[in-house]
């Protein structure tokens, strides 16, 4: 799947669709890690860690810069991803202890 070899929009769209499937699969793996964190953390207050959140976003932005893609866009996406992950982890924390 090399976009440089595409000659039609159908190829572009098929490539994007495949990447989207892969991204969702990676998100499923990430959320599995959030379930593990919810199981391991001793109290609900430990779920939100602003220092770790900032570190994760900064790491993603640095990787974006390395790959020469817009770091500000990646930062905004990671802000949403981390907040969604925190919400998911809190729900899992509560579910496991109910």
Residue map of PLM features:
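Domain-level signature for soluble enzymes in the chorismate/prephenate branch of the shikimate pathway
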Residues: 1-98
